[in-house]
């Protein structure tokens, strides 16, 4: 069964995602009823053990499908953004509106790349340099200076991404103190030249971009 109208690449995974989600949801609901009604007191947890195994099986089936579904959605969004960028250029030329979206597309590509456990540092550094140019062009296009917050956060993300990629490229190890900080969710972003630090700047840039709308 295909979705109508077809939305490739999501059409190929949506039905599998729905089926897996329904199966997982049904098991969770059954578990909730079982424990809410305290039925385990009547069967010495016999059904509870079976439900637990079913839950693990459903979860194992759901997770890869959910990842594929998310990836398909991201692919569609990426294509739409590129199409919108082209439309903006055709309607307005390379205005701040154009460059701000170009910055976001570039930054997202970088963030997706450097979030991986292993990546090509030279390729990442090239993308970071391209982002640096786009940020400078966005700043130049912002004649009024009204969009300083976004330009500043984009510049900060570009810098933090560059510092992290440089660390990976040059194989600079983290200190013992840094390693401890990276294990703490409250301080993880404080580590210099780290992905969490770059990610924090990325999220702030996204917030500032959304405020432009």
Positions of predicted regions on the chain:
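Solvent-exposed, amphipathic alpha-helical segments
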Residues: 16, 20-23, 27-34, 102, ...
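Extended amphipathic alpha-helical interaction segments
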Residues: 48-158
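Amphipathic alpha-helical interface segments
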Residues: 1-2, 6, 115-118, 201
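Post-signal peptide N-terminal segment of secreted/secretory-pathway proteins
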Residues: 1-43
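Solvent-exposed, polar/charged alpha-helical surfaces in well-ordered, non-transmembrane soluble domains
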Residues: 12-22, 26-29, 53-60, 64-67, ...
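Polar/charged, Q/E/K-enriched amphipathic alpha-helical segments with strong coiled-coil propensity
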Residues: 29-56, 176-189
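Soluble, cytosolic/nucleoplasmic coiled-coil alpha-helices used as oligomeric scaffolds and tethers
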Residues: 34-37, 41, 72-75, 79-82, ...
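A cross-kingdom marker for long, charged
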Residues: 126-213
């Amino acid at each position: 069964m295909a979705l109508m109208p077809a939305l490739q690449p999501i059409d190929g995974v949506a039905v599998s995602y729905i089926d897996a989600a329904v199966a997982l949801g049904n098991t969770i609901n059954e578990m909730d009823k079982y424990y809410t009604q305290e039925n385990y007191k009547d069967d010495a947890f016999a059904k509870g053990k079976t439900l637990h195994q079913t839950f693990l099986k459903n979860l194992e089936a759901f997770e890869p499908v959910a990842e594929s579904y998310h990836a398909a959605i991201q692919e569609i969004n990426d294509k739409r953004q590129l199409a919108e960028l082209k439309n903006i250029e055709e309607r307005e030329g390379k205005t701040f509106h154009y460059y701000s979206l170009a910055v976001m597309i570039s930054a997202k590509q970088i963030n997706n790349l450097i979030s991986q456990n292993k990546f090509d540092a030279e390729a990442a550094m090239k993308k970071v340099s391209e982002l640096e140019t786009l940020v400078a062009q966005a700043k130049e296009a912002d004649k009024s200076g009204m969009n300083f917050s976004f330009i500043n956060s984009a510049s900060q993300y570009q810098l933090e991404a560059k510092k992290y990629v440089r660390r990976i490229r040059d194989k600079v190890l983290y200190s013992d103190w840094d390693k401890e900080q990276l294990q703490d969710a409250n301080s993880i972003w404080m580590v210099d030249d780290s992905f969490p630090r770059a990610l924090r700047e990325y999220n702030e840039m996204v917030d500032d971009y959304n405020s432009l709308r």
